Amino acid sequence: MRISTDGIRNRILKKIYVIVEIKGGFGNQLFQFAFANSLRKMGYKVKVKTNFYEQFENDNFENTYRKLVLPETLFGFKKTNKLTNRLLVWAHKFNKSKKIKKIFGKRNNSFFIKLKDSDYSLEKMNKKVIHLDGYWQNIDSIISNKKYLIESISKNLILKEGFDNC
């Protein structure tokens, strides 16, 4: 019996956890959810990280006020919990630590990688946990996810009215 390479690839991808950071305003959120959906369609297990918006819960923020306009539930995603968010921070610091590199030498961490949109490539998507942080402003991603985006944001009654009035 021969196993197809697609079957093997899908089994491998289902064991890779991808966390897409959601941040910015309405437009950036659309790009990020479209990108996350593209990864999900490829077979990755995808969650979103929305704790960026917690900094705006008190009045002493320095950046432009932003609000999570599009909750992850509209798009069928689950968000990371506080423990996962802390582990991501720790894993990133561990990977970047000069002391760790000095003690253990340069090593390739096969478990975790954090990629910015400028560093992203599918070839780097080979770790057990992948944290993707960026705006992912690629119009092709929006076009290929157009139906998904419209269906998702139409679950918000205010936004649905906007589509119905067009």
Predicted stretch roles:
Residues 27-29, 55-59:
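Short catalytic/ligand-binding loop motif for oxyanion handling, primarily in non-cytosolic enzymes
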Residues 18, 41-46:
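Short helix-capping/linker segments at secondary-structure and domain boundaries
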Residues 22, 50, 134:
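Pocket-edge structural micro-motifs
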Residues 1-13:
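N-terminal amphipathic/basic-hydrophobic helices that include classical n-h-c signal peptides
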